């Protein structure tokens, strides 16, 4: 079974910036990867403090250009995600496979780091590697250029995970595209004040449906020709 993939839709200063896609190494760090996946989907619901246990709406608190991004600080008042914190899983994966390597902070709770360069032995054995950014590194580098960090490593403009979730298959990508198309249609409709109508619809299980459609057209044409010849 293929490793799961999750996504972050980012905004910079409230404006859509783009999407990054992350492959989780569930085959090697199953518990920690599953923990991260659940935080992306928000399936754990609301925590004891009344806050969603979800990366959606959270910010990247620290961004060091060409070094690392730190995010995921969503646990309030040391509220655990599980009944107890996860033990550090496997350190068999290292940080030399960057850039784009993602690892969990020492607490193994919700905080994570995206490494923008090869770290090597500096953090190996301390942070559990759980995945890697497979799409969107160029986007992150462009954001680094736009967001000039302060001496405290805090971005000058808020970088927010506006939406996140799991990409289970190609249907998730279609939903993402349809969501953006839907927004565009709504905007155009509001401006033009014209209704959006589904002129026709149906299911095409395979190529036979197309053939049946063509056959029906041919039969209809033949019937019309017969009537025409009858009256003529």
From Swiss-Prot:
EC number assigned by the record: 5.2.1.8
One Pfam family here: Pro_isomerase
Bilayer disposition of the protein: Single-pass membrane protein
Location of the PPIase cyclophilin-type domain: 7-166
Presence of keyword Transmembrane: yes
Tissue specificity comment: Expressed only in flowers.
Molecular function terms from GO: peptidyl-prolyl cis-trans isomerase activity
Enzyme kind, highest EC tier: isomerase
Segments passing through the bilayer: 212-232
Subcellular location: Membrane
Cellular component, GO annotation: membrane
Glycosylated residues (UniProt): 108
Statement: the UniProt record of this protein carries the keyword Ubl conjugation: no
Keyword annotations from UniProtKB, A to Z: Chaperone, Glycoprotein, Isomerase, Membrane, Rotamase, Transmembrane, Transmembrane helix
General function of this protein: PPIases accelerate the folding of proteins. It catalyzes the cis-trans isomerization of proline imidic peptide bonds in oligopeptides.
Protein name in UniProt: Peptidyl-prolyl cis-trans isomerase CYP26-1
Gene symbol of the encoding locus: CYP26-1
